[in-house]
């Protein structure tokens, strides 16, 4: 399993979306998220977007007022994860006008289409958007 978790955090440090692919006890998640978020938000824009945390890496990218944070195994390719984040952001931009907070179920669904059990399974923006549009058109 390469990806351990995927977090979407605002610039105030509040978690807006979290998806875990590794079993982390629910009671430990807030403290862990808080520490990781602090590490990422305290870094300057000229610093590297990769941070070592315990026995894995944290890869993050800032878009507007949101931080996309992904925890991965130490063997995972950092650039591939940055590309995954960028692809996810492009798909979210295609699906939502500005605010995704009113459609978190759809944001989770899109992420589930891209990542399954910690592995990247789909990166085609076109395929994901076709499936999302088909599913949500039926509602």
UniProtKB/Swiss-Prot annotation:
Main localization of the protein?
Golgi
Signal sequence region: none
Q: Which SUPFAM superfamilies match?
A: SNARE-like
- List keywords of the entry alphabetically: Golgi apparatus, Membrane, Protein transport, Transport
Annotated GO biological process: protein transport; vesicle-mediated transport
Specify the protein's topology with respect to the membrane: Peripheral membrane protein
One GO cellular component, as annotated:
membrane
Q: What InterPro entries does UniProt report for this protein, alphabetically? A: AP_complex_ssu (IPR016635), AP_mu_sigma_su (IPR022775), Longin-like_dom_sf (IPR011012)
Q: Where is this protein found?
A: Golgi apparatus, trans-Golgi network membrane
Q: Which family does it belong to?
A: Belongs to the adaptor complexes small subunit family.
Q: How does it assemble?
A: May be part of the adaptor protein complex 4 (AP-4), a heterotetramer composed of two large adaptins (epsilon-type subunitand beta-type subunit), a medium adaptin (mu-type subunit) and a small adaptin (sigma-type).
Q: What does this protein do?
A: Probable component of an adaptor protein complex. Adaptor protein complexes are vesicle coat components involved both in vesicle formation and cargo selection. They control the vesicular transport of proteins in different trafficking pathways.
What this protein is called in its record is AP-4 complex subunit sigma
Source species: Dictyostelium discoideum (Social amoeba)
